């Protein structure tokens, strides 16, 4: 519970840092990839249900499309589709990419979807579904994106951005560089982003911040114990204590912004 006028540090991690924390959790703590994926999917499903509630839609009156890539981010979306179906929501999946290229964890979730009988449409074979959806889950790319988006992926992203349904992004909106916030050719314009474990830098750097919508950091089992492999290199601040800072004048400068005292030292030396 936050105390009055408290200012709290929040970790902002790079893709490389997040991979290290994820690996530590799997190898040293013993939490399997599928468990982390299930918890990420639960957080996504919860966010979808909140959006449906805000729109005054009952689960059986809603229709959700989970747009999934072939990596673990896509696996989060596949698992989310199953969890939404369990809650009575009509849910479909659009797979972008060949199912033969699914990661091991995503392929595991895909097999479960088949057993559930949930509709999975291949964009390469069938194109984008000509339907309206209450909510669209963006699970195309996660923090591992390192190239410009072209081809089918670009077409899918631009189609989603033109649709009226609300968009929930898994971890980070597809097309946003998770370190810099830059757009990799095109990007999902999300209404909500559920980021997993720790917040990503690109969600708070522009233009990425303007694409993320409302950001929520979900606890999926990756804790600060993983910082034993290396502390995050960047933090931001949160808490109601931030209200103590005055708004800057539009025509302000360093002479009018005020003064600050920094007490600093090196670790183990001060």
Question: Model-derived features: where do they sit?
Answer:
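Small-residue (G/A/S/T)-rich helix-start motifs and N-terminal tracts that mark the onset
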Residues: 2-96, 103, 203-270
């Amino acid at each position: 519970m936050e105390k009055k006028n408290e200012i709290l540090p929040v970790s902002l991690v790079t893709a490389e840092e997040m991979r290290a924390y994820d690996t530590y959790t799997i190898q040293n703590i013993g939490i399997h990839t599928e468990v982390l994926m299930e918890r990420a999917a639960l957080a996504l499903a919860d966010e979808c249900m909140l959006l449906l509630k805000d729109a005054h839609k009952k689960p059986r009156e809603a229709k959700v499309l989970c747009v999934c890539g072939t990596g673990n981010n896509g696996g989060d979306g596949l698992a989310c589709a199953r969890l939404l179906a369990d809650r009575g929501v009509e849910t479909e999946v659009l797979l972008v990419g060949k199912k033969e290229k699914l990661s091991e964890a995503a392929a595991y979730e895909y097999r479960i979807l088949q057993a559930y009988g949930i509709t999975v449409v291949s964009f390469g074979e069938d194109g984008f579904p000509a339907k309206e959806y209450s909510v669209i889950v963006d699970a195309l790319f996660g923090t591992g994106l390192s190239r410009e988006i072209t081809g089918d992926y670009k077409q899918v992203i631009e189609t989603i951005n033109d649709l009226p349904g609300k968009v929930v992004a898994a971890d980070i909106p597809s097309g946003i560089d998770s370190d810099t916030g830059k757009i990799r050719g095109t990007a999902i314009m999300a209404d909500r982003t559920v980021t997993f474990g720790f917040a990503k830098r690109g969600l708070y750097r522009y233009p990425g911040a303007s694409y993320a919508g409302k950001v929520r950091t979900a606890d999926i089992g990756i804790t600060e114990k993983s910082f034993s492999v290396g502390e995050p290199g960047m933090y931001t601040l949160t808490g109601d204590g931030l209200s103590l800072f005055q708004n800057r004048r539009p025509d302000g400068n360093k002479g009018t912004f005020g003064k600050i005292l920094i007490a600093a030292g090196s670790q183990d030396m001060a």
